Every structure is written in C-alpha cells, then in structure tokens.
C-alpha cells in the first residue's frame, strides 16, 4: 500500500540517503554485484546500473544453456508503483521467459517503493523519473555483447506498463514489441479526478487512489495526454488485463487498442474469472499461466518473423 509506504518514508528519510549511497556494499550479500542464484531452467545474476548519479539495482536472468559468445533476444521488465523487481519474479515472468530462451533484465525503479534497493526516496518518484530510469536501463542492457540489438522487448506491469509505453513512444526504433500487463493508463485521469486544477495540487505531498505520493508525481501527469503520447509507438503491443480490475479499469486498455495501438499486430487479451483483478498473477495461478503462455507466444512471433 503506497499510503503506508509514505508514512514509513517520513520516519526513515533522515537515514535513507546515507544507506542508499552504500547499497552495493550492503551487509546483504544477495544484492551485491555478481551475486548468482540458480533457478529452474535459468540463472539470475545481480547487475547494478546507473541513471546519472542514481544507482539502480537489477538482475539478469540467463537461459540454462547461456553462451556469452552468442546473442539473445532481451526483455526488460518493469514493476508497478509500490512494488519491486522481486514482485515481478514472484509472478514468474522472468523465469518463464529465460526458460524460453530470452535474456531478461528486471530492476527496481528509483523511489519506486520503500522496499526497493535502488536510490531515491519514494516521495521523489514520478512517472517521468521512472521513464528516465527505464531509458537508462535500456542503454545499459544494449551495451552487452550478448544482447541482440534487433530484438529488445519491453514488459511492464501497472505503472511500469505506462512507463514502458511512454518510453517506447520516445524510442520506438529500439523496441521491437511490447507486452503490457494491466497498464496504468488511468493515472492522468486519476490526477484530474482528485484535483480540479493543477493549482489545487498541494505542495510536498498529494493524494492519489494508490495513496499518498509526492506532489510532483501528480503535477507531472496532470496534463498528460496518455493515448496521444503513447500512440507514437507503431510497433506491435499485447495488453493483458483482468476484466475485474477495479484499480485500473479494463476499459482503459480497450481504449488503448482503439485509439493508440491500432495496428493489426496489436491485441488486447482479457483475463476472466473472479480473481481477474489488479495484480492477478499473485493469487490467480490459472490466469497467470495463461497470461505468460500467450504473452511469450506473442513475443516469439516477432523472433520468427525476422529469421
């Protein structure tokens, strides 16, 4: 819950900056550069990168038969607000994709939550700072010799879906296709519903449906034309969305397909059932398995098209 996180942020803000500066040398070896974990059918390796002066914690997932002298398609996965890359892992996306032959990079947005390992306080995070983070991550991933530069994909959950869509609109030549999971295309509308005008947004902190956020978070999306902006991306997009999502209504994804992603290769996949809510992968195994199957099949098609 973002509201609970911001309360904790206030209590810990004095010490957090000093701790962030030493994250890579933390007492927790599991977040140290190069820390390796063997998973079923793949290997996870901690790999930090930077956005300017900010340290970004991330992990590569490599296929079981990974050979650094070869090149692999890559998926960069972005989490939602108040979440972390560990939640993306819990949803099984990185593991399944690596088992399918992809190199995957997941990371914690700077200020994306109180539980993340990257720099920046939660109250200083905005959709646009996350967009800058994702672009920096893309640049970092593209420096790896084993990354197939012609097959870079983005996957984003919730706010990470919106951030991925905005980033792809700016860097459409770098992104072959996108997989968006219940993308938070509602955020600008939420801001306008909460405040009658941008002048009504309070200083320091503000309220959104997800809870208390920094005022800049609301200000930076208040006048955002979401669909007009994301429509600059002309590649294929698959959106997967639960029909019982109350936080980000399904209708927002319907509108995205109707107004922004109008190409023949773009599609909206509904997830049905009582558990098809926001974040359905966490408690709806059948829905998660179906989403991952159709999602990876969608990406696989874009590999075969150019072989």
Give the label of every model feature segment.
Residues 233, 239-241, 245:
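Short beta-strand/loop motif that positions the catalytic acidic residue
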Residues 166-213:
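Hydrolase active-site cap/lid region
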Residues 90, 249-259:
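Short alpha-helix in the alpha/beta-hydrolase fold that links the catalytic acid
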